[in-house]
């Protein structure tokens, strides 16, 4: 399947929102208390999940197109997704820690973690999530989202990205100029 820029943006928005909801539910259940959002944005969206969703889909498409044995393609895509998403998680964690002096996640209590930004346990979880995304979630999302007329999709994308941009700009200004907003730590 070939996706144009608008479809990539649409999936970025949907998976950023679904990732935020999934993490909120997971943290609430794991901590046995109502989870309060951590992060840079304050509007129920996590860009890392949106980027990772697109990256995973593209890795699976690339492997399906280039590796003719379907089992080998599946294994390569899953391992590629684990590697790519883990690398992205490490880079994002490192940048957020260095730039904003705040860790938004901390795997220091997990064995074999690297600088507490990544660990094998969560990397394997990314592999499982990539299989669920590609085999169950994404096919349903394609059907649901493509049922919406194109001009409405474009309008929605522009509106949501505008809100995200304003939110990010506002929070960046508050952090950089010390006006009270701070990232919520783990």
Which sequence ranges carry the predicted segments?
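Aromatic-rich, lipid-facing transmembrane alpha helices and their immediate juxtamembrane interface loops
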Residues: 1-186
């Amino acid at each position: 399947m070939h996706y144009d820029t608008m479809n990539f943006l649409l999936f970025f928005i949907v998976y950023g929102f679904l990732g935020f909801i999934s993490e909120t539910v997971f943290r609430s259940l794991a901590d046995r208390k109502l989870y309060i959002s951590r992060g840079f944005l304050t509007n129920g969206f996590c860009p890392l999940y949106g980027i990772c969703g697109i990256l995973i889909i593209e890795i699976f498409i690339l492997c399906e197109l280039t590796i003719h044995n379907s089992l080998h393609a599946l294994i390569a895509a899953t391992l590629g997704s684990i590697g790519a998403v883990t690398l992205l998680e490490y880079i994002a964690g490192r940048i957020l820690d260095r730039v904003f002096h705040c860790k938004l996640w901390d795997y220091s209590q997990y064995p074999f973690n690297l600088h507490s930004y990544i660990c094998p346990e969560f990397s394997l979880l990314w592999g499982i999530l990539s299989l669920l995304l590609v085999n169950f979630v994404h096919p349903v999302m394609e059907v649901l989202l493509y049922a919406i007329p194109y001009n409405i999709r474009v309008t929605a994308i522009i509106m949501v990205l505008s809100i995200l941009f304003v939110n990010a700009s506002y929070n960046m200004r508050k952090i950089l100029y010390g006006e009270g907003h701070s990232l919520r730590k783990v």
